[in-house]
Amino acid sequence: MDIKLFSYWRSSAAFRVRIALNLKNLTHEVIPVDLLKQGGEQHLPSYSAKNPQDLVPVLEHGSHVLRQSLAIIEFLEETYPSPALLPNNALERAWVRALSMDI
């Protein structure tokens, strides 16, 4: 399955998704979206069609388009359960979730 991540290098939300993709060893292509160039490439019609909120990240998984970093990470965890991003212990899972929100 082709995975494309539309990302900006300084976006903490996109960074979360890059971390998840790499921890899961998923082959993916990073498509840079410059949020500053010419008023922001995220406002171009071609990008707005992927995410009407004009935000990064966006993940294309085959023909499906996903947005919002935590929703993307949950999708990756459910679609590719191994290696797991979340521990089995409830307290440890809470710690990982809190840490992900700090990024």
Region spans (language model):
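GST-like domain detector, emphasizing the conserved glutathione-binding G-site
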Residues: 1-103
